[in-house]
A protein has these predicted regions:
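A phosphate-binding catalytic loop at a beta-strand-loop-alpha-helix junction
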Residues: 72-88
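Phosphate- and divalent-cation-binding pockets in alpha/beta enzyme and binding domains
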Residues: 65, 84, 193-197
Length: 215
């Protein structure tokens, strides 16, 4: 069994959208070859299915729910952690038409790891209370990444680990970060860093929610 977060939101009906990246063996830079380990079992199985094949799923599980309040919301995502971000934010804006102030920070190593960007730029255009920011931790030369100097400057996004970008470009200048509700999902190291960031900024436990998909 493997746990996958849903990218779909309730208004999309019975269609279930998952973001699955096939887990290839790690690359051994010293040997200049792939490590001799098996690829991901569940992701390999999913990628081997054809349209019309039947599979068995169960759920949903977990407690990654939206708090019912008027507080500002901060979303932080990385990698395949994009899935529940889309689900939450589409429900908040497309269904609830929320007036809450919301920012979403999404990080990847290079541009090729980013996806759904057009979805969130469209939300940003449609809802003035929503802002979307992107950061790359290790941009490639071919990314031609145009670095933003601050929140309001032109550019593609920031450079650095996403939690550091949130601190440097948002939280350090925020009047009351302790009043923000935090929602996050990403690789284990990112989750740990964002969890600590919340503690450092005095966020109450009940206002910190994350989706752990077993990474």
């Amino acid at each position: 069994e493997r746990a996958y977060s849903m990218a779909s939101y309730p208004a999309e009906g019975r269609d279930i959208m998952l973001n699955v990246r096939i887990a290839t063996p790690p690359y051994d830079r010293k040997a200049n070859d792939w490590m001799d380990v098996n690829p991901g079992i569940a992701s390999s199985y999913i990628f081997s299915r054809k349209p019309g094949d039947k599979v068995t799923i169960s759920g949903p599980y977990g407690e990654f729910f939206i708090n019912e309040s008027d507080a500002e919301m901060l979303y932080v995502g990385g990698g395949a952690g994009m899935a529940p971000m889309r689900s939450h934010l589409y429900h908040l804006f497309r269904t609830l038409k929320t007036g809450r102030k919301i920012t979403f920070w999404y990080g990847g190593r290079s541009r090729k790891e980013l996806f759904y960007l057009d979805h969130f730029y469209k939300l940003e255009k449609d809802f003035p209370n929503f802002k979307f920011y992107v950061a790359l931790s290790d941009p490639l030369e071919e990314d031609n990444w145009k670095v933003k100097k601050d929140l309001n400057s032109e550019g593609d996004g920031f450079i650095g680990f996403i939690h550091n970008c949130v601190i440097d470009h948002y939280l350090n200048d925020h009047e009351s970060p302790e009043d923000i509700e935090w929602y996050f999902c990403g690789p284990p190291l990112m989750n740990q860093a964002v969890q600590k960031m919340g503690e450092d900024f005095g966020i109450p436990d009940e206002n910190i929610r994350f989706d752990d998909f077993g990474g």
